[in-house]
Amino acid sequence: MKKYPISHYKKSGSSLFVNGGTLTVTDSECLVEYLNKEVVRFSLWDTVVTKASSELLYEGIRLTHDGQSIDLYFPKMGKTIRELREHFHMTD
């Protein structure tokens, strides 16, 4: 299990900006916790495309929720996980 420190959560519209708490990555899922409370849990497949992208979980990632699914935006790459999956030709 890998844990990535994040500094604070704040909501802005439908986006959750992750700046605090802990993002835990297991073999099957990711869990974001803040103040020991589960904030959001989602499939690892939707979150980490490659080892390279998993290493980019750092302050500034943005979690977005469209009502059905959650996506992560990586500022350094300027792409979301969905875009990365499309780039690597990965499908559901």
Residue ranges and their predicted role:
Residues 9, 33-35, 64:
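A generic structural motif
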